[in-house]
Regions:
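N-terminal secretory signal peptides that target proteins for export/translocation
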Residues: 1-16
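Extracellular/periplasmic ectodomains of large secreted or surface enzymes and adhesion receptors
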Residues: 433, 441-494, 501, 897, ...
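Repeat-blade elements of multi-bladed beta-propeller folds
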Residues: 45-55, 80-103, 120-149, 162-189, ...
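A short beta-strand motif characteristic of beta-propeller blades
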Residues: 72-77, 112-122, 157-162, 197-201, ...
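Short loop/turn segments that connect beta-strands within beta-propeller blades
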Residues: 107-111, 152-156, 192-196, 259-263, ...
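Bacterial N-terminal signal peptides
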Residues: 17-36
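Blade/loop signatures of beta-propeller domains
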Residues: 44-72, 475-511
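Bacterial Sec signal peptide processing site at the extreme N-terminus
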Residues: 36-44
Length: 924
């Protein structure tokens, strides 16, 4: 991978620094031939009418220019919430919408406020990511509340309000004489510029073949009679595109081509991404169309597997037209996914991703490897001008990179930038998650270079609204289970690893809120302090309100690589293990603000199974992993997860970072390690190395029970093979009881241990151990073991099971474990006998137990008290089956592994009392 010369920093930035920026583009007119023609009347102000400049979302503004050397910070304007949308510009005014649905109009030269309008929905109208769009004299604003508002952009007066009855997360598309709006539920609304409805079209009805309530699990169960699958996936959470009079819509993992025939619509084709690392419908994370009508789809199917494919409409068929070189990713490659639309010019693709060292790349059709233009991680689409590409980073910095080579100019803001910038008349408008819109322009009143952006914002804020305190919870949880004792505060619910609770769960289930996520996740939702926390595999840590999903803060740390690890909430702190090929750190953050308290190094790879974060006893945080050397692809078969091994120099044993589930042995430099740090300072309290017993360490588990620390680790099932390799052959694994304050061993046994892809759990003086591998060579049987926590003595061994994946869930009434592509089993807690089984046949689903129900992928709800009867299923918002839902504080929370989506549901009586914002009418 080639790189451009290093970035030239314009200013120092303690947290944020002074900016200078980019360009802007002209008013656009959609033609029947392509995306748009950029037309400009002599002397008229330039316009940037919609997201990524044109309705194709090509990001290509070739006739615009900026002079980075002359740009300075002229003004900022504060709204009431984080800005997650792109600004638009028309006739000397700039318009932007914040996360809470407030639309502000400002003078384009000064950011002096002109008018503002709050869209309908009240306090629940949050998670607004749909950018506004200019259509003639009107401004179209689509809201998460399900209201679509048409405003007079000169005065802010309401021209029309349309109740679309479900959220909108994609920007309105402005065509020649129409505006198109696609809802989250994949309904398409065609409107006149003034908002007069023209026609509607429904993907769920016409393509999926479902006529019921698409947001109701009971309705899906009644219609299907079984659980929903990837074939029922339907949501449209990303931005659609428009080419001439053909809409190109990402919906349910497919690409829909829909013609506007005037009085109605006509379905042209439904495009499907070819099979690659699976055949299920993938998630679209970004979509763009070039001037020739080629559709660029950035997609993800599973576990970092994705790329940018090109689809082309030929007649009434959508055909694959190639893959953008250098965009392919999977678990055997060092690259991370992209989560944004690409920008395109003359067949050359500009693409961002949240990966340090590869943040912005240029992909030429004749080059196998991309060229790195900026190392800065990003989830925002790039924007092209005549001589530069504008690249917005998760660290709040805007890079203006010369297309012809040479150093970039870097400009700072006060928070992450997650939406594309707008450019007009040589000015650059930057939306920021600190709640401000930044204006950089070649003006004499620009803030002197060297001024920090935080200070500059304070003296240049033209808004009458004070800077918002974004981290404050505005809609706190209420109800009898809102207290901390009902928090699901770590991946397995509590530090005993029980993966179970009883919070009165009962049908019916009802949607409460939905939000978009620019990342992939392998852990369960974690809650505490009224917030829900998410750690993406690419290194973002995100906190949102539990009641509404409103963004509170976002932090990104570089060099995190496929870290499928969970946060843990304890006493106002958040502990997050962040692993990577270059370095791995446990980080402690202030849970209320995201401020870093301390960080401490660890080694090894979490791989598939070690999702758990540290456990905490008193003021001691304890974590376990392995050590050793890693690469994206390992050096021999049993160190890899598919693909051809890559031999290492000097016959070194190198493990894949995401390695095999078949583990006869581990590399000789893998040492099982346990660390303990002071929770308040991060100072190392003690450390243990169990390599005298065996080699391994990454396939392990921890739990705290009755004031003791329990640790279990797998060394591989084949003792003879280990002996031939010169490794300790005496034990296939270890389970130990330790003093959590000192690390001293109280007892240990090598008779019973986790066998990978599983942690251990404890309750009522007993430990429960499972796993995916066989325990020893010569048998294919797997078992669940129950040990006496006092001395490690075996209490019972279950009958043979397919596997016991992730964790043995230990409730007050039920003992449950899941199997990979097999039966989930309910065990008698006194004998280990299988009481009954449920044919879940999921992949690696992380079930949870909220008695008497287990919760699976797509919010599946299975009643263990009724012999595994399926009670509710769907909506199918994810095409993968890796994660289940959790019940915390009287609510259900679900994060999709593959589709970049987070939802909350209510249940029982609350399902009537706490409806989603898009079902509450009227709202004013």
């Amino acid at each position: 991978m080639r790189s451009t010369p290093p970035t030239r920093q314009r200013v120092s930035r303690p947290r944020v620094a002074l900016l200078s920026t980019v360009l802007w583009l002209p008013v656009l007119a959609i033609t029947a031939l392509g995306c748009a023609d950029c037309v400009r009347v002599a002397g008229a102000a330039e316009a940037w009418p919609q997201f990524m400049f044109d309705a194709c979302h090509s990001g290509d503004a070739a006739d615009r220019d900026v002079d980075p050397e002359r740009l300075g910070l002229v003004a900022t304007a504060s709204l009431g919430d984080a800005i997650l949308t792109s600004p638009v510009v028309a006739e000397g005014r700039v318009f932007v919408v914040d996360g809470s649905g407030r639309c502000g109009a400002f003078d384009a030269a000064t950011l002096a406020p002109l008018w503002s309008h709050v869209t309908r929905g009240g306090p629940q109208n949050v998670n607004n990511v749909a950018s506004p769009a200019v259509a003639g004299p009107y401004l179209h604003v689509a809201a998460a509340s399900g209201w679509h508002t048409v405003l007079d952009r000169a005065t802010g007066a309401v021209v029309r309000e349309l109740d679309l009855a479900e959220p909108v997360m994609g920007t309105p598309l402005v065509g020649e004489d129409r505006v198109y709006v696609v809802t989250l539920g994949a309904r398409v609304h065609a409107l006149a510029f003034d908002g007069t409805p023209q026609w509607t079209w429904d993907f769920v009805r016409e393509v999926v073949g479902f006529d019921g309530d698409r947001w109701s699990g009971a309705a899906w169960l009644a219609a299907r009679g079984e659980r929903v699958t990837w074939k029922d996936h339907f949501v449209s959470s990303r931005d659609a595109s428009l080419f001439g009079r053909t809409l190109v819509i990402p919906a349910g993992g497919r690409t829909v081509f829909l013609d506007d025939t005037g009085a109605a619509s006509r379905l042209r084709a439904v495009g499907v991404i070819p099979g690659y690392d699976g055949n299920e419908f993938p998630a679209t994370f970004g979509q763009s169309v070039d001037a020739a009508g080629n559709v660029y789809v950035q997609w993800h199917r599973r576990d970092n597997a994705g790329r940018t494919d090109i689809l082309r409409l030929e007649g009434d068929e959508a055909r694959p037209a190639g893959v953008v070189p250098g965009t392919e990713t999977n678990i055997r490659m060092e690259g991370l996914l992209s989560f944004a639309p690409v920008a395109i010019r003359d067949g050359i693709v500009f693409r961002t991703r949240p990966q340090q060292g590869r943040g912005l790349c240029r992909h030429r059709p004749d080059a196998a490897e991309p060229e790195v233009l900026s190392e800065r991680p990003s989830v925002a689409p790039p924007v092209l001008t005549s001589r530069h590409v504008l690249h917005a980073g998760l660290d709040g910095t805007l890079d203006i990179v010369p297309l012809g080579g040479g150093p970039a100019t870097s400009l700072g803001t006060g928070g992450p930038i997650t939406a594309p910038v707008a450019v007009a008349d040589g000015r650059v408008y930057v939306p920021c998650e600190d709640g401000r819109l930044y204006l950089f322009a070649p003006e004499p009143r620009a803030v002197p270079r060297g001024t920090s952006a935080a200070s500059a914002a304070a003296v240049t804020d033209e808004s009458t609204t004070p800077p918002p305190d974004l981290t404050t919870i505005r809609s706190p949880l209420t109800g009898p289970r809102a207290g901390a004792e009902h928090d699901w505060y770590t991946n397995y619910g509590n530090f005993a690893g029980q993966n179970a609770n009883d919070q009165g769960l009962e049908p019916p289930l009802r949607m409460r809120w939905a939000r978009r996520l620019e990342g992939t996740v392998k852990h369960l939702p974690v809650c505490g302090g009224g917030r829900l926390y998410t750690h993406t595999a690419e290194g973002q840590i995100i906190a949102v309100e539990q009641d509404t999903g409103r963004l509170l803060w976002r932090r990104h740390f570089p060099d995190v690589f496929l870290s499928f690890t969970s946060p843990a909430y304890v006493d106002g702190l958040l502990l997050v293990p962040q692993a990577g090929l270059k370095r791995s750190l446990v980080r402690c953050l202030d849970a209320a603000t995201g401020a870093l308290r301390w960080e401490a190094p660890f080694t090894g790879s979490p791989s598939w199974s070690r999702q758990f974060p540290p456990v905490v006893h008193g003021r001691v945080a304890i974590y376990a992993s392995g050590s050793g050397e890693y690469a994206a692809q390992g050096s021999e078969k049993f160190f890899t997860f598919g693909g051809e091994p890559v031999p290492a120099p000097d016959d070194r044993e190198v493990m894949s970072f995401i390695y095999s589930n078949d583990n006869p042995y581990y590399p000789r430099d893998h040492r099982p390690r346990v660390w303990a740090w002071d929770l308040d300072t991060g100072k190392l309290r003690w450390e243990r190395d169990f390599s005298e017993v065996g080699r391994g360490g990454n396939d392990c588990g921890l739990c705290i029970l009755d004031g003791k620390l329990y640790y279990s680790v797998f060394f591989g099932y084949d003792a003879a093979a280990r002996a031939r390799r010169g490794l300790p052959a005496g034990a296939n694994g270890l389970t130990a009881c330790l003093d959590p304050l000192t690390g001293d061993t109280i007892w240990q046994t090598t008779d019973h241990y986790v066998t990978s892809k599983c942690t251990l759990s404890g309750r009522d003086g007993r430990l429960y151990i499972g796993g995916f591998n066989r325990a020893r060579a010569g048998t294919d049987d797997r078992h669940v073991w129950c040990l006496d926590a006092r001395d490690g003595r075996l209490v019972w061994r279950s009958e043979a099971v397919t596997s016991a994946l992730n964790v043995v869930s230990v409730g007050e009434r039920f003992l449950f474990s899941n199997a990979l592509r097999g039966r989930g089993n309910v065990f008698d807690r006194d004998t280990g006998a299988v009481v009954h089984s449920i044919l879940t046949n999921y992949a690696c689903c992380r079930f949870t137990l909220s008695e008497p129900y287990v919760l699976g992928a797509n919010m599946d709800m299975i009643d263990l008290s009724a012999d595994g009867r399926l009670v509710s299923t769907g909506p199918a918002i994810d095409s993968r089956e890796c994660l289940g839902a959790v019940v915390s504080n009287g609510r259900i929370f679900y994060t999709s592994q593959a589709s970049g989506f987070v939802v909350s549901q209510t249940y029982g009586p609350d399902s009537a009392a706490l409806p989603p914002v898009w079902e509450v009418r009227p709202q004013r």
